[in-house]
Amino acid sequence: MADIKVGVLACSGEEFLGGTISRLATRRVMEELRPDRAVTLCLPLYIAGGEEERNFAKEYPVIAVEGCSKHCSTCATEKFSGNVHDIVDIAALLGEDTALAKTVSARDLTEKHQDMVKIVAREICAKMDSIV
């Protein structure tokens, strides 16, 4: 596995479950699964003009983790830094009904929700591992 850093830009939406799963899966990758490779990028800061976020995305590959069909992470990266290396689309992975379900507080997550987070985290890791 290459030692290259990879930016992971999660959905920041709070209206749907897909956003919550996106953020929790990204955190799991960053803290547990690929702590030496994953660098999380903050979407609100990115959009607001955060040069550090934007410059990182110009220099390193970025994986966008999209919670819904708006694809805000991909759009922001393409607008401010260039193409994303890959996309994890939660609606495609878990189903649109799941991605667009009512959001759940982190403290109210069920085992089923945690399983969804694990599925998305594994997909992020698979995409990271394909980057040589």
Question: Over which residues does each language-model region extend?
Answer:
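Iron-sulfur-associated redox domains of electron-transfer enzymes in respiratory
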Residues: 1-132
